[in-house]
């Protein structure tokens, strides 16, 4: 077999495996996005999707201490539920996710809103928000390193 044939086989093999890896990574990132939404009712479990150095930007505030950020979110949720007299249920809708993968880094952008069911109160639909996540692959697991949330124009 000539050097040209060997080179061609190696290049084609590399292309075959890299496209499969990209497809697997895309599927894995999409699963993390879905879990991120599905775990809105369990913020402690949702926190396991985050890197310890995650940056969180929302409502004009930037938080770089992930442990304190999650503690604040959990405490805020508990305080709201205490005022409502019971658990609030969040049903998360994620629409039109777009994901780009750059090696071990992924950028995801999507629209998110919640149907919120407070205890003993009427349900309400939150305004839609843009969510951008930056995920980093550590070993075989994708974790959220950066979250940016902002209102969709006109809200």
Question: What are these model-predicted stretches?
Answer:
Residues 2, 10-14, 18-52:
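Short, low-complexity N-terminal intrinsically disordered segments enriched in polar/charged residues
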Residues 26, 43-102, 123-126:
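A solvent-exposed, acidic/Ser-Thr-rich amphipathic alpha-helical stretch
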Residues 33-41, 53, 58, 77, ...:
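Sec/Tat-exported extracytoplasmic proteins
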Residues 50, 112-114, 148-151:
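Short beta-strand segments enriched in hydrophobic/aromatic residues
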Residues 90-92, 104-114:
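A short hydrophobic beta-strand element
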Residues 99-107, 122, 135-143:
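A short, structured loop/turn motif at beta-sheet edges
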Residues 115-125, 153:
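Short, cysteine-centered beta-strand-loop-beta hairpins and adjacent loop/turn segments enriched
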Residues 128-155:
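Short beta-strand edge/turn micro-motifs at domain boundaries
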């Amino acid at each position: 077999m000539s050097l040209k044939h060997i080179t061609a086989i190696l290049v084609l093999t590399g292309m075959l495996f890299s496209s499969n890896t990209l497809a697997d990574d895309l599927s894995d990132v999409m699963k993390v996005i879905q879990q991120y939404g599905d775990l809105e009712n369990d913020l402690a479990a949702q926190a396991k999707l985050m890197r310890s150095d995650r940056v969180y930007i929302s409502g004009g505030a930037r938080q770089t201490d992930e442990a304190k950020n999650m503690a604040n979110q959990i405490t805020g949720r508990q305080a709201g539920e205490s005022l409502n007299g019971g658990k609030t249920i969040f049903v998360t809708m994620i629409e039109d996710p777009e994901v780009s993968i750059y090696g071990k880094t992924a950028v995801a952008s999507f629209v998110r809103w919640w149907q919120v069911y407070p205890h003993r109160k009427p349900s309400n639909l939150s305004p839609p928000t843009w969510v951008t996540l930056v995920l980093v692959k550590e070993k075989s697991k994708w974790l959220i390193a950066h979250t940016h949330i902002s209102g969709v124009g006109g809200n």
